[in-house]
Amino acid sequence: ANEGASLQLAGLFNSSHGSVPLQLAGFFNDGEGLHLIQFAGLGNHAGSHVYLQIAGLGNSGPYWQKDREGLQSPYAQLSLLANYSGDAPLQIALANISEQRSFFQLGALNFSERAHVQLGAYNSGEIAPGVRLGLVNTGAGGPFQFSVANINTSGRTYGFSAGVWNYAEKHDGVMLGVFNYADELDGVQVGLINIHRKGRFSILPGVNF
């Protein structure tokens, strides 16, 4: 453990409760103070202030707390298995979780309250605004969503939604797919089966509005 130093270097483990700009460890770094970079073979954890985390398996940044000042989530988290942070602009891993905002997430599983770009097998959250590309997309927002299945059951979606199956409670814009469904639609559906439950025509092949 160290209360403050310019560098922590260890073959196994580093722990700090003070300001340590750089932590390098073979296995794990843990810090509760100010940290610029954490680099570890297995994992990193920062409780309050960190800018960059790189690990072989996983990274954990500060938990988002509305009433707590002085928190600095990492600008970037890079790992093979999983990244978690309250608010991280860039995350690349098999699974990524950013509780609040994220600019870019790349992984098999991506979760964010408000994301701009999500690329993965499963993406969830609100696109605000941006692009979501995956096998399954869930959430709200827009303007571009592309997947096998776009399933949006909370909030309004808008823009262009393309997939084999598009489902939205409320959609403003274009739905392009084999099966399109919307409770409320301000736009057009193009596909084999188009359902606009509250529209003039509930079900139409080809095009519905």
Predicted regions and their residues:
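Surface-exposed, glycine- and small/polar-enriched segments that build interaction surfaces at terminal
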Residues: 1-209
